[in-house]
């Protein structure tokens, strides 16, 4: 009964203490019932609906609230190719809004191959990174293939997909199937470069939930994890990625390969939509022959497509998103699954608890942390790079794509917070960098390399315990 009273009081007081940050109240001052965790401190969101990734944290009020919804609108705005407000799309592009890829601030499914074609949104929220086989980017083509273009302009290329399947078996006889997509570029715009000389790797969008907390994590804590991430008995040895962001060598935290140390709003608007801004003022296809002359279809390309103020509102929107609280934490099966999570040593990489920088610190882009600082958060990630293997089905998770210090077989540990709501928010259960895992079980069974030992511990569990571990993941 004592814990129940605390639980009721916690929910009753939550709106009050999240709005009193200036009085020095810290989430660690709140006594939380045993077995229950606030996912993101004062940014924890008590919501179990399709808007669970796309809603403001409770502290968002006043000016912050109006800016949040302004940023939300810009995030979802369908860009057009004219020069008016909301324009600037193209001339070539891979998506026409942030929300067309990150639906409800989540991830759309890999419709390029799940629907047998490019889908209604071109690559349908899949980014296709393309380089020469030596890893060099192509000048005048940005970092991704732009498979769509405004009227009168040629898209940069298209993609064909071939799926490979293989059936495996657990020791108890239950079967499971893995598949992976193989891609081939065709209709490549640059006639001087043969498609067979190109290398491509595909991404489906990451969830944007928890981006503010992620950017606010104390880097010293991640560096400490890297220093002690050495578990030879399980083959685990994580390392940090460092990249040059805004002219500063910084610890990478976001992106599939921890290749970003900052919110990538300006990069996304430029690289994915062709929307120029103060950080990326040049058109992504500036040097292409079809752009010669400086204008096309009567459009001007000598002014920025979106203002710095608008970019800052989108930044704030992403920083202020709430993180869904865990659900069903007292369910017997979920509790058993949590035990299995630790028994399989998943927690050695999917680290449960981290802390953000002290209140009064700033993000890399200069934004202060009045609401994100001094928080205890539970992202279930160490944000380190790990070798995920190249053996499963002859390819493993090695995409041969280098990003910063990350090699092709290395991936950042994916934060698991909010993962259990993906089907409700986005209507599908595709996981991993390219969506090849069609459910959480397949995502686990794709673990190789440093994840091999944990996968094998999971594989050898009785079916009841495997199912319980999945139920635990669904509670996050």
Residue ranges and their predicted role:
Residues 2-10:
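Sec-dependent signal peptide recognition
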Residues 6, 33-49, 275-293:
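Short, compositionally biased low-complexity segments
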Residues 16-19:
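C-terminal motif of bacterial Sec signal peptides marking the signal peptidase cleavage site
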Residues 21-24:
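Bacterial signal peptide processing site
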Residues 29-62, 66-243, 323-433, 442-445:
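Short glycine/threonine-rich turn/loop motifs
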Residues 211-212, 225, 229-302:
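Active-site substrate-binding loop specific to GH73 endo-beta-N-acetylglucosaminidase modules
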Residues 279-323, 333-339, 410-476:
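Extracellular low-complexity, Gly/Ser/Thr-rich intrinsically disordered linkers
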């Amino acid at each position: 009964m004592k814990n129940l009273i605390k639980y009721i009081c916690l929910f009753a007081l939550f709106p009050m203490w999240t709005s009193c940050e200036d009085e020095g109240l810290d989430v660690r001052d709140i006594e939380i019932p045993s077995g229950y965790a606030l996912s993101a401190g004062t940014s924890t969101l008590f919501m179990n609906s399709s808007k669970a990734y796309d809603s403001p944290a409770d502290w968002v009020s006043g000016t912050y609230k109006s800016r949040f919804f302004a940023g939300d609108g810009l995030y979802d705005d369908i860009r057009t190719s004219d020069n008016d407000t909301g324009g600037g799309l193209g001339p070539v592009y891979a998506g026409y809004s942030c929300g067309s890829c990150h639906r409800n601030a989540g991830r759309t499914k890999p419709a390029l191959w799940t629907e047998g074609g490019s889908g209604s949104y071109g690559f349908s929220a899949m980014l296709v990174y393309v380089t020469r086989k030596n890893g060099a980017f192509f000048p005048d083509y940005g970092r991704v293939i732009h498979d769509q273009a405004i009227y009168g302009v040629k898209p940069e290329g298209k993609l064909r997909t071939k799926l490979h399947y293989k059936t495996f078996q657990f020791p108890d006889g239950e079967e499971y199937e893995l598949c992976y997509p193989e891609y081939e570029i065709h209709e490549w715009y640059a006639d001087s470069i043969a498609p067979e000389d190109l290398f491509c790797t595909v991404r489906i969008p990451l969830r944007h939930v928890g981006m503010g907390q992620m950017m606010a994590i104390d880097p010293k804590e991640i560096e400490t994890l890297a220093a002690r991430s050495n578990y030879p008995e399980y083959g685990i040895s994580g390392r940090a990625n460092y990249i040059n962001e805004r002219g500063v060598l910084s610890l990478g935290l976001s992106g599939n390969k921890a290749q970003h140390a900052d919110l990538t709003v300006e990069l996304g608007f430029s690289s994915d939509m062709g929307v120029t801004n103060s950080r990326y003022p040049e058109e992504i296809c500036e040097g292409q022959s079809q752009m010669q002359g400086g204008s096309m279809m009567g459009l001007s390309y000598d002014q920025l497509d979106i203002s710095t103020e608008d970019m800052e509102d989108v930044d704030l929107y992403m920083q202020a998103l709430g993180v869904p609280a865990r659900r069903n934490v007292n369910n017997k099966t979920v509790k058993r699954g949590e035990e299995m999570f630790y028994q399989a040593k998943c927690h050695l990489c999917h680290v449960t608890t981290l802390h953000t920088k002290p209140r009064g610190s700033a993000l890399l882009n200069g934004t202060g942390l009045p609401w994100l600082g001094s928080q205890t958060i539970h992202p279930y990630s160490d944000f380190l790079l790990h070798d995920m293997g190249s053996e499963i089905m002859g390819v493993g998770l090695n995409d041969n794509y280098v990003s910063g210090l990350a090699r092709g077989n290395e991936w950042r540990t994916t934060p698991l917070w909010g993962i259990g709501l993906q089907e409700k928010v986005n209507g599908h259960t595709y996981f991993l960098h390219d969506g090849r895992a069609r459910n959480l079980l397949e995502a686990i069974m794709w673990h190789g390399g440093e994840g091999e030992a944990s996968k094998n511990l999971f594989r050898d569990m009785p079916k009841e315990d495997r199912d319980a571990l999945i139920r635990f993941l669904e509670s996050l």
